[in-house]
């Protein structure tokens, strides 16, 4: 059996188009097609807690993942039958770093540091202490001071700094040393028996840098800040230079921002996935075209239309399908939204709706002519 692919992706400004750049209209639709493939195991890796991940899935119509690594790597959920099951063994794995102290106890050690402002209670958990800070904060000098205080208590921690460019605010997460995106991904890989050659990560911001430069196959979407791009390249060891892909746009007519960049990078590492993005299936070219055909009929004149998604598909429409449908009267290059139902439309309404995206053939039993 062919090895499956583990696609791990950050959410905000990676899959979610909630930055300043414009999203390619077809990108998330192609992501949905890809996620339907049994050969793809999808894991969201986010700073969000469970409720916010679920909210993002609903708001942006994202595919339901197989796994979710939340709270910047401090929680792991397995999703089956729409039920979210936490991995308690992951909590045990990371708990030893904090010597039994929870996030509230740690916060007392930093009460006098005025640039830091505690985030809302729902953004904290037992193993995640999160602060807001000015985006211009000199974090490179501050973090060693914080680490020194924790080390004096025998506490091992990691510090994740990033900037929310939309809200223009700095974000600082303090976690058990083992609790980070990279370790959580590796824990997931080990438990689900994925090797490095069948795993890929996508991200955009400072809290993704450790994974981006880890040697795992990784994608940096095109909308990432330039300083993140430069820092990722600086951290990347020479022997891992081929493991990081910088999305640049142009793939399948997409712009490389957000999910478009994820798809572009995935196809770079796994070329076979391009066909899955187009059709969601693994059939031959003719079978793919047959599966993507749709018949639309107007109710008043009984006009019929055969829709295919791209012009190239016309040359691959199987002969048997054409025989079933009858001969073709004429061909026009028009555009269609496939999700629109035309079952009750008249001819004029059909023509208007078909002028948006795609290609169609009007069907007739009399003659065949191209225009």
UniProtKB/Swiss-Prot annotation:
One of its GO terms (molecular function) is phosphatase activity. Residues 291-371 form the YcgL domain. Its EC number is 3.-.-.-. It comes from the Bacteria. Keywords: Hydrolase. SUPFAM superfamilies: HAD-like (SSF56784), YcgL-like (SSF160191). InterPro entries: HAD-like_sf, HAD-SF_hydro_IIB, HAD_sf, SPP-like_dom, Sucrose_Phosphatase, YcgL-like_sf, YcgL_dom. Residues 1-288 are annotated as: HAD-like hydrolase. It is an enzyme of class 3 (hydrolase). Gene3D superfamilies: 3.90.1070.10, HAD superfamily/HAD-like, YcgL domain. In the N-terminal section; belongs to the HAD-like hydrolase superfamily. PANTHER family: SUCROSE-PHOSPHATASE 2-RELATED. This is Putative HAD-like hydrolase Noc_2718. It comes from Nitrosococcus oceani (strain ATCC 19707 / BCRC 17464 / JCM 30415 / NCIMB 11848 / C-107).
